[in-house]
């Protein structure tokens, strides 16, 4: 909120943003997730169960984080998921261990949060992003 508040201040935005019960804090419910999952433009994927940084965890903990959310999404949406997103997504937050665990769960693609451009030869578990502000 501090960063957001500073940006809004620079933009001379007058309304105050509260850190409690703000629209930025609202999460999607399963009804909304199911609705968006039916759209061809979107895919629903995993992002760990509790948003812990995978590379900081033991093998067993990392596996539980990855498997936990995949099982929940499979059950709620009644389908296999193939996309995932690393918490934080910077290079030091995932490794070949996490990629192997994701592949074992049937995940086919997991973008990073590293800035850059992809090619047809890019690793689908290390995809780059182009950031826009």
Regions found by a protein language model. Give the residues of each.
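Extended, charge-rich helix/loop segments that form flexible
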Residues: 1-39, 43
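Catalytic cores of peptidoglycan-degrading enzymes
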Residues: 46
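C-terminal active-site subregion of NodB/CE4 polysaccharide deacetylases
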Residues: 38, 49-52, 56-133
